[in-house]
Each structure stands twice: as C-alpha cells, then as structure tokens.
Amino acid sequence: MKATRRCILAAPAVTLAAPVVTLPRRANALYDTATVNAAKNTYDVADATKCKAYLPLLDASGKTLDELAANWDRIATDGDNVRRYLGTVGVTSPLFKIRGGLKGVLKAKDLPDAFDVVAFAEASEAFLNDLQDAEGDAYGAQFADYSTSVGSGGQSPSATMLGKARKDVERARTSYAELLRLLAPLR
C-alpha cells in the first residue's frame, strides 16, 4: 500500500513520532574544569585590604598587553584571538580580572599618602575605555565580512576592524603606562 499524504496525516501521532536519540552534550566552553579553576585562582589576592597584593595581577596584565602588541601579526588572525588576550574570551588572560584588580587597589586600606587616588581612578577609567574599544573592534571583526560594510585601503572589512583594534590596543598600552607610573608609590 502506498502511503499518501492523507494517510500520514490521519495516522495516530504515536506512529509519527521520531525515535528519541540522546546525543552527548557539547561542552559550553573550550576549557576543562581544571583549567577554568586554575585560571580563576591565578592572581587571587590573599588580603584584599593590602594594595601591594594587586601588583602581580597588574604587572601580568601589562605584560599581556605588551605580548599582544609585539606579536600582533601572529595573534590577530581573527577577533577572538585578540579578545582572548584582552580577557574577554576565556579566563586564561590576567586581563580577565583587571577590573577587579583596579577596583581593589582603590579600595585597599593601606594606600600610602603619596598615592594619588583620584588620578589613578581617572587613569583606570581611561584604560578600561581603551580596552573596551579594542574588544569591541575585535568582536566586530568576527562579523564584518558578513555585513554590508566595506573595508578601507584595499583590506577586507574584518582586517579593517582588526586594524582599528590594533590602534585601540596601542592606546590601551599608553593608558596602562600611566597607570604603572601612578602605581610607583606602592612599590
């Protein structure tokens, strides 16, 4: 007997149900639990009231920015690679915790009188804005080739966005140098 559309529509729902197949769930992250836990515990601050406790995180963040800038052509093959260094994709970059580190310095109970809290707060805000600009341009590079945007200088739209991100990273490095200068009384 040939099955017609009418026969199929008239059939009980039980016979139409597709077999249930349980597939293994895909991991939500690129990192296993041990890697995530190790990254979260990296640069943990033993005593949040001590301003010097944040210096290792801040120093490592500066080195990460320097590494990104020095190896840009190798790293910036796509926006997510840049964002991985900026701490917005994954948890392995020290910049992943930079907001908390900067805020922690400002909240520390043992800041020396020579430390300019207002200047540090303003420099922190400028740095975080530059970092956010770099992250936004790197994120946009992921999708720029699929949009109606046009690249400049004979480059693809994503290459243009990565070029903007590179300038943002350089601005962030300049802002960060100012932060490090302001941290001198803590050393």
Task: Name these PLM-found stretches.
Residues A17-P19:
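Hydrophobic h-region of N-terminal signal peptides that target proteins for export
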Residues V21-A29:
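Sec/Tat signal peptide C-region and signal peptidase I cleavage site
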Residues M1-T15:
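N-terminal secretory signal peptides and thylakoid transit peptides that target proteins
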